[in-house]
Amino acid sequence: MKRVKKILVLCTIFCVIVGIWFYKNKSIENDNTDKFKLDATYDFDIEKLKSEGLPIIVDFGSDSCIPCKEMAPLLEDLNEEYRGKAIVKFVDISKNGDAVKDFPVKVIPTQFFFNADGTPFKPKNVQQSNLMMYSSEENEEHAFTAHEGQLDKSDFKNILNEMGVN
């Protein structure tokens, strides 16, 4: 009888430990899923993204924009391929116009690029990159690096590679 009690106690302890482990790992997985989900239309916070310590690509567009729709599968692929190495976000400005208020967006789609330290990405060869550099009106410091229009996968990969992502 004592042996049966010992076995029951050990089984109970084991089940509790396994349950705690599953609970903790599930919440970590949910945090990572939220952090790396592509659509940031309603929860876009660039400062929070910058604090993650990963390079960032933000694409401002709209579900009703044809070039944006054409880029959607590419952004999904990039988001999946670079998960944990870079953050790729899409913000639908027709659903959340406030998300774009601090960015110089003139047309959609427009992409913005940030280094892992949160600073605007600066390509080695600005003239050949087809990227636009924006400076702050207050102090003339480099504030944004952007691209207007569509980019293809090789363009994104080249930029990410130059940002130090393999």
Protein language model features and the residues they cover:
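N-terminal targeting signals for export/organelle localization
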Residues: 1-36
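A short beta-strand-turn-helix
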Residues: 35-54
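Short active-site neighborhood of thiol/selenol oxidoreductases, capturing the structured segment around
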Residues: 51-63
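Thiol-based oxidoreductase modules, predominantly thioredoxin-like and allied folds used
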Residues: 60, 79, 83-98, 105-108
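Solvent-exposed loop/turn segments at secondary-structure junctions
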Residues: 62-66, 93-98, 118-120, 150-153
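C-type cytochrome heme c attachment motif
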Residues: 63-70, 110
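Typically the conserved alpha-helix immediately C-terminal to a functionally engaged Cys/Sec
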Residues: 68-82
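Non-catalytic, surface beta->alpha helical segment in thiol-disulfide oxidoreductase systems
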Residues: 113-166
